Each structure stands twice: as structure tokens, then as C-alpha cells.
Amino acid sequence: MTAASSKKEVSTGTKLSLKTPKDFFTTLEKKGKVICDSQKRQSLISAYLKKAKQTAVDPELLDEVTYLVEYPTPLTCTFDKKYLDIPGPVLVECMKKHQKYFPIYSGASKPKLTNQFIVIADSVTPKNKQTIMNGNVRVLTARLEDAQFFWEADKGVALKTLIPKLDGVLFQKNLGSIFAKKERVKMIAQWLNKQTGNQVSDKLIKDGADYCKSDLVSQMVFEFPSLQGQVGQLVGQIQKLDPAITTAIRSHYLPHHYEDDCPKDILGSLLAVADRLDTIVCCFENKLIPTGSQDPWGVRRAILGIIAIIQ
């Protein structure tokens, strides 16, 4: 039999001879450099991460990388320390989401992000190892250069000046902009606050609702949408906003999924419930009702999020 070539050049087209069919997997692994057993591939990757003392490994990233490689070879790479000035969540986003790298942390009790990462590569040989490592560092560096530019630009822009720009971001057809949505969220949160004993001031709710979506028009969130809330919190802290507001900018998006944490602050909880209630009502008003197979606006997730928060 002949092992088929691939874009990754895992095989070389060498003819592999089998004495019996049961020799297929072992022969393919030894001579064709393809490990067919996904569990074995994942075990090899996990063992290396454990050896590198990385315990907080993203299981979704681990699963994804397992199925991206045929003969995993972990390589530890290093990028310039100057990029550690970029906020940690942004660095991690660049590494994990875009490049499928595993960030390396130092310290067990208080993990601190380092300027190293682990890339799981295919077809590594002594001759091409350094070339592969240099290539991955070069690609990540380009990402980090962009991230650094966006971060420097965003932190110099007052979040307050971004709020009016939300009027140019569509929430849903027939239901206005994100600016209109945050105004509805403000009214709902004020009502919820009254129903629960006025736990926070009316002014704090108004300010929290105004700021909670402000980073959606930042350059960083435009490039990295999953950082919504986190960017606003970080920029707000630099600009000395009320700590309750900066916390709520991030926490009102929680929980992201059923295993996620819920907001631990009152303002964030009120805004989180109000935001989800608005989304649910708007979707039903717009006939965007979830079915057994479709829920593009995450209505079910919003409902489950409210239940988790109020429990």
C-alpha cells in the first residue's frame, strides 16, 4: 500500500508493506508518522503540557488541536518580552483562538503569563524543527503587533466618547441599534432594582447601562469580538471609572455557557438579567423564536443564563 501525501506532508509517498491487517496502525505510526488513535494523540499532548507544568489547560483547545495534527510534536517557543505589556486576556486570545497555541504560565499558586507558548506541530524533524519554531514565532509576533497597536489606540480613547457611536451598530432589524438596546436595558435594570429592594443607586445603574456596551465599538473588540467586556473593563480601570462600573462591564456578559461563573456583583447581575430579558423579548417580537434545531440568537442560552443568575 502507499501512504497518501497530504498538505502537511505527513507522509512521503513511501510504500508500506503489511504482513497482516492488524499491523496497519503500528506500521502507519512508525513508518508513516500518523497516529490514528485520537486518544493516544491527546495523551501525548497532555503529557507534554503536564511536563511543562501547565495544569490549567483549555479542554476545548486541547480537543481541537488533537484533531488538527496526525503525529503531534510539541515545541516550546519564545516571543519578545515587550509584548507582555499587552493585557493578559489579549495575549491569550492571540495565542489560543487565532494560532491554536498553548500559553505558558509560571507559578502554581498565582499563575503568571510568560513570553513562551507551546505549539503542537506535525512532521517535525531535526532539520526543520528550528524553522518551524521560527515560523510560528514570526506569525504570532505579527498578531501581537496588531494587538499592541489596537490596545494603545483604545486605552487613549475615553469610553464615554464611544457610547454615542453605539447608535451606528445594529442590534436587530426593526429593533434599532445597540444604543437603543442599552437604553432599554437601563430601564429594565432600574425596574429590577426596585423589585429587589434598591440594592444599588439609580445613578449607578444608569452609568453602568451606559458604559456596559461601550467597548463594542473599540478597535480591539472589532478585531477580537470574544474580548467584549474584558476590553471595556481594562480600559475603564486605566481611565479610573467607578470600580463597580468596570466590573459590571465585564460581568454582565456572564455566564457565557452553562458551566460558566455568574456575576458576583449586584450591578453586573442586574444588567445581565436586563440584557437577556431584552434579547428574549426582542427575538419573540421579531419572530426569531428558537426551534428544536435552530437558535441563532441564543434565546435558550439567555433564558438559562437568567435562571442561573437568580438561583
Where are these regions (language model features)?
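Amphipathic alpha-helical "coupling" segments that flank catalytic cores
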Residues: M1-Q311
